[in-house]
Amino acid sequence: MSEFLNENPDILEENQLPTRKEDSTKDLLLGGFSNEATLERRSLLLKIDHSLKSQVLQDIEVLDKLLSIRIPPELTSDEDSLPAESEDESVAGGGKEEEEPDLIDAQEIYDLIAHISDPEHPLSLGQLSVVNLEDIDVHDSGNQNEMAEVVIKITPTITHCSLATLIGLGIRVRLERSLPPRFRITILLKKGTHDSENQVNKQLNDKERVAAACENEQLLGVVSKMLVTCK
């Protein structure tokens, strides 16, 4: 039986790592406007002329700015013309505005850990495909009073990788420092990627062992160096 190698042995460049490309492209096209019609016009223009400096696109920008100007409503000093809001209505209205839940998704978790440096190679875990976006699961309702969970499956470059535990520890430290306390973090080796898969999994998810490892100054120093490259 041939030895397992990382499913994606090709080293990725930083600009090849998964990002929220669609959102950033849309923001670039809109250029500060929230008008969907503007987005459509610019998209069509960029298919003809890919230069953001084109004269046609600049003319459209000027037109958009003119169209965005609104004539202010006529001011009035007649306060009696406004319906008075009762105390009951003001109290009831106060509860209508609810903050949208701040959800944390797989992309956000990936952004936190992809730039961790590999302890052996001068590359990041994302570049080596040790961590992959599709191997991250997040269960988060957004409710600050409910527990949430992050499950990450890492892929060592070789089946006998002696640094798999250290890499997992680096990921755990990074997430524990970045995420709210309500998140439960589970780090696993991807099935079939390591000779000591079960043993390493137990070490990475044993609270007492992790706490003891973090008290080791030498080990913590190595982890800190791994996290220096995080963005």
UniProtKB/Swiss-Prot annotation:
Record keywords: Acetylation, Chromosome partition
Residue(s) carrying N-acetylserine: S2
rRNA processing recorded as keyword: no
Region ranges (Disordered): 1-26, 75-100
Keyword Plastid set for record: no
Something else known: Present with 1800 molecules/cell in log phase SD medium.
Family: Belongs to the MIP18 family.
Function: May play a role in chromosome segregation through establishment of sister chromatid cohesion.
PANTHER family membership: CYTOSOLIC IRON-SULFUR ASSEMBLY COMPONENT 2B, CYTOSOLIC IRON-SULFUR ASSEMBLY COMPONENT 2B-RELATED
Official protein name in the record: MIP18 family protein YHR122W
Species for this entry: Saccharomyces cerevisiae (strain ATCC 204508 / S288c)
